[in-house]
Amino acid sequence: MNERLVVKSFGPIRSIDINFRKVNLFIGDQGTGKSCIVKLYSTFRWLEKTLLTETYSSDYFTKFVDARFKKQLCGYHRIDDFFRDDTYILYESALYKFVYAGNTFNIEKKNGTITGLPKIMYVPAERIILSSAEKKLKTFDGLPASNLTFNQTFWESKERFKDGYSLPFGNLNYEYDSLNDISWIEGCDYRVRLINASSGIQSALPVCIVSDYLGNIVASGNERPMSVKELQKLQKETSKIMENENLSDSVKNAMLKHLSSRSRYNCFVNIVEEPELSLFPESQNSMIRLLCKVNNGTTDNMLLLTSHSPYTLLNNLVLAYKAYEKGDDNIKRMVAEIVPPEYHIDPESLTAFSLTEAGMENYQSVLSESSGIISKNDLDSVSELIMREFN
């Protein structure tokens, strides 16, 4: 994880400079820029991917900034009207450097090694619409196009888990009757249609099954689905390499490995808005654990969370990691009984920011430098305000 995002004067963002890690948490009130940050990150990761697969050339976006970079690319997440005259955006990874400034957009290709392609999923806060609608929605009038993408993946996930899926809380099980196109939620002694279930279940189910579904696809290492055009191009490039008598076997192998990396997903980038939506704190904790388990499925997976809730914390998973790594066999066993290693978070792989409306730089890290966990003092401002008003 070596991606960096610098943004100035864009929508609600005044000035940020963020280096992303394996787990990234953005906490703050409405309108502080949490979603804006992760939408930009999603946009640039997708742009990297489309350039690597040569679906589009760099010139396609750099020569027509307003129509293609702003309206087409940024418009996917409905952030195309966030630009100002003094907007500056920089995104940099091992593979590309993207810079927007003065209504120009530049793309610089770097010499980083391609190890595969990311499977990127943006999980919107509006996901409850999918559960309450039940029938597959073909249009999302008034909502970003990203909702339509998530809708399609949600239905693929339902087919994958139609024989049953256990939610991470409440002893609840999900079943999908594909013949009649009906989703069911089963408790210990009851069964209701998903459209009649609680808002918490309607919000949580799409997150759970889509995350599990895509995480399993990436972890399996299978080739990703390709269009006929992509497949033909890959076959043509493979034949060209194999038929070139001027290349040594070692060079051919290296070039073929490079081509192969374009046909496989090596990581799942899971971007989830408000995982705590309509959930009780204990259920929020179970949801976070599931997302972290999926994120730990492969080394290069990434998890980005936006949240309003101080309950959406990762400290227990960090502390469990630290105790497990330092402990003897007996300590490891006791820690694993409380928090199994599949949920653990390495503090070196975590970043967390609090965003506010005030100040030129309206963000700050809430990680303690000494402990590596999220500082309670930075997140307890609401409690202090309530107590001050009460007193």
PLM regions and their residue ranges:
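P-loop NTPase switch/coupling surface
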Residues: M1-S178, H258-L259, G297-D300, T312-L313, ...
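Extended helical coiled-coil dimerization/tether regions that scaffold
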Residues: E92, K97, M121, E126-Y265
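Loop/turn-to-beta-strand initiation segments
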Residues: N266-C267, T299-L304
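Walker B motif beta-strand of ABC-family P-loop ATPases
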Residues: V269-I271
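Walker B catalytic acidic pair
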Residues: E273-P275
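Conserved D-loop-proximal element of ABC-family nucleotide-binding domains
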Residues: F280-P281
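Conserved hydrophobic alpha-helix in the ABC-type ATPase nucleotide-binding domain
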Residues: S286-L291
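H-loop/switch region of ABC-family ATPase nucleotide-binding domains
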Residues: T306-H308
